[in-house]
Amino acid sequence: MKYSICKGVLWQETDGEIVIVAPKQDPAYLNESGSIIWKLIDKGYDETKIVATLSKEYSEDDVIIRKDVNDMIKDLLKNEYIKESN
């Protein structure tokens, strides 16, 4: 599944971390790994490609990475920072 950043959502990277600002939401602060996932979503990567990219970057089990990516995507969708796209 591919995702895109929702209209009206702004973000800025500062010191390796991303701050997300969206209408009707408090700012969200992403840590380093969350920031990497956010930037890959912004580049148009699908969930599988995000997991593969992170697996190459970190020496962590794919199952753990997939769960972390999935959890973050669910949270971003719930807060309407991203949406499903084609």
Regions found by a protein language model. Give the residues of each.
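Acidic, low-complexity/disordered tracts enriched in E/D and polar residues
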Residues: 1-42, 85-86
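Long, charge-rich, low-complexity alpha-helical segments
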Residues: 29-86
